[in-house]
Amino acid sequence: MRTASALAFTLLLLGTSLAGCAGLGGGDDGKDSDQSLEVPLWEVGDWWLYTFSTPDYSDDTARLVVASDTEEDGSAYMLAISSETEARRHAVLNHNPFLGRMTKDNLSAFENGIAQPVLTFPLAIGEVWSFSLFSNDWSATVLDISGNLVVISAQSSDGASLNYVYDEAVGFFSSFIWTDADGSENLRMMLAAGGEAHTGEVFFVRGGDLYSNVWDNSDPDAEFRDTFLVSDHPSSGEWTEMIYFLDASCGSGASTISLTLRDHTSISALARVWGPGAEELGTLGTIPYPSEEYTLTLTFTGNTNLRLKIAGGITESWTL
């Protein structure tokens, strides 16, 4: 028998999902909660609009679209994004595991080249299974089925949790929440809308982390220098671009930041300067055809903050 706390969590998630899916076709269709749910059949052009919330970055919204149903010799779909800019953002921030290949048997996402069954069909109350995601191992349980909605909770040995709701009416998640052991949310993914027959160009950027750091400075003057090597993607070869994401802020008075990124031939690939009171948040940019070693040089004056993430990217696109 489930504990009172588990039941309370189930009711909370169901309430949240029902509210978030109004108008999407979700809800109770009279299905017996003892009945299992089979894997949905996606078609090219099916789409889901999600809002992604994280503690470190502003919320962003992305439309995920089934771009192909012939991946992995016909055993997987390709899930892409309707905006190339958003595809790049997701590649460098790396907070959305449900992009790229998704298996047809369980809608399994791939992590480090291995399919991970975040869902396992048929879904039935009491089903238990394990998978890896976000570089962690999880044990998942189906807590409840109510109408089209399946409430699932996964726990890790370090006390973190994944709480998510699968909605049979839309064939994907209505919510997906990753929480640390201390209760802080790393990711909240909420469905806003869904549909069929998307038309236009869609994109998937195969990404790989190259560099990431955060600097908080309060000294009168500080300088930082670092290098990183641009290695190829392990299976797809050379990156076609580097994608960078940055947040920068300077206090009042004489606070300043300067940033220079040079390649192995000392050619400047990126140069930025921020003056007193300046603030720039969520900037996304690209550097074409990266290779070999890069040197990053930063100078800080006064109260300043800088966050920089750089990833390699290889863009694929489909016209639907």
Predicted regions and their residues:
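Bacterial Sec-type N-terminal signal peptides, specifically the leucine/valine-rich hydrophobic h-region
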Residues: G15-L18
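Acidic, serine/threonine-rich low-complexity disordered tracts
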Residues: D29-R88, N106-S108, N112-P117, F121-D216, ...
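Short, surface-exposed beta-strand/strand-loop-strand elements in extracellular ectodomains
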Residues: S252-V273
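Edge beta-strands of jelly-roll/beta-sandwich modules across compartments, strongly enriched
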Residues: S255-I257, G302-T319
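Beta-sandwich interaction modules
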Residues: A271-S291
